[in-house]
Amino acid sequence: MGIKIGLVSLGCPKNLVDSEIMLGILKKAGYEITAREKEADVLIVNTCSFINDAKEESIRTIIELARNKINGRCRAILVAGCLAQRYPAELMAEMPEIDGLVGTGQVPEIARAVRRVLEGGKVLLTGSPGYLHDAYFPKVLATPPYTAYLKIAEGCDNRCSYCVIPAVRGPFRSRRMEDIMSEAEELANKGVKELIIVAQDTTRYGIDLYGKPMLDALLEGLTGIKGPVWLRLLYTYPSLITDDLIYLMAKSRKICRYLDIPFQHASNRVLQLMNRRGSKEEAARLVAKLRADIPGIVLRTTFIVGFPGETEEDFQELLDFMAEAKFDRAGVFTYSREEGTAAAEMPGQVPEEVKLLRRERAMMLQQEISLQKNLKRVGEVIEVLVEGKSLKGRGMYTGRSEGDAPGIDGKVFFKSGFNLQPGDFARVLIKGGTEYDLTGETVL
């Protein structure tokens, strides 16, 4: 019987791509991949450390998986990803459950790490995070077969005062356009219907290689690939959304009328403290332009509340902006004080209970906005990517519209007399809506 490897991927889709590459490398090296923890000889946790909640989830997962050393056949626990990159000494000193660490820059060395821990050694592979994968890296997709993430760059050159990403992921570095196209064509040949383009900052794509933003040129090339029906953009930085990109999105039916734009706040004073480029006024103009030039576009954003120095007036300014902009989707997070960041040392740290109350108030406002927007869609016929049968009843299915990214947005629950399969597209008449989801039935 061969050596079996299990992997748990935590955090964002960018981390999931690293997990897919690690699985591909291990499979190519002759290891068997298993989803059953108790069957694995080696268990890998690809961790996140972006905010405190993510760190706690990573540590909990490591402890839970380590129980398989007693109750299963597990011989070693490997920790990979951002937590390993950020806290190597602390993890090895304080968590004896861990047999090895693989940092964000050492993904290609995962097979060597597995080999070493199986021999009984301890492994510490953390160094400068300069790794950048290409189309030749083997991958095992961890997504449903009709959807895939396409990571076009690594690292980040933005220096937001609250963020550890540049420290754990390194400087921004783009993949070559022809290399991305090659991977996209391979995914299309495998039957992928939805390509989701990700990076720490997708709109910065190409600046380091070509001297200017090239996301629009990349997208134009991707629209020419036969196969994928939807191209979806995540993690766009507002100040780099160009007129050329907007024009391309408006004219191409392959690019989802959907943009994920983390504005983070609306008080210019707080934005300055966050070291974010742009202002509330520029954000408002961008939102208006996107809606005017791309009718029906769905806009998702994220905001941070309780940032150091945020006053009640600053927070009210954010609420007013949310009420005026009426984003289709919004995530609201409480500020997480991360050591090593400029914001962690700022005066005016906001008490935790105030942060939580502000988050609740912002989310209540957004839920009402989302509900009203969804109810206004009743009577529309939309295209839905079928994800499978729903447990809500006989003949019920679940899927997503072009306005719904997997894992972060809502669903469409619908009834159909057709025998639909995951990855099919269906035309659905919307008959109802909640804060997050739509309901309906298929039409011819």
Curated annotation (Swiss-Prot):
This is Ribosomal protein uS12 methylthiotransferase RimO. One of its GO terms (cellular component) is cytosol. It is an enzyme of class 2 (transferase). GO terms for biological process: tRNA modification. The gene is rimO. GO terms for molecular function: 4 iron, 4 sulfur cluster binding; aspartic acid methylthiotransferase activity; metal ion binding; protein methylthiotransferase activity. Residues 3-119 form the MTTase N-terminal domain. The keyword Cytoplasm applies. [4Fe-4S] cluster 1 binds at C12, C48, C82. It comes from the Bacteria. Residues 142-372 form the Radical SAM core domain. Its cofactor is [4Fe-4S] cluster. Residues 375-444 form the TRAM domain. Binds 2 [4Fe-4S] clusters. One cluster is coordinated with 3 cysteines and an exchangeable S-adenosyl-L-methionine. Belongs to the methylthiotransferase family. RimO subfamily. Its main location: cytoplasm.
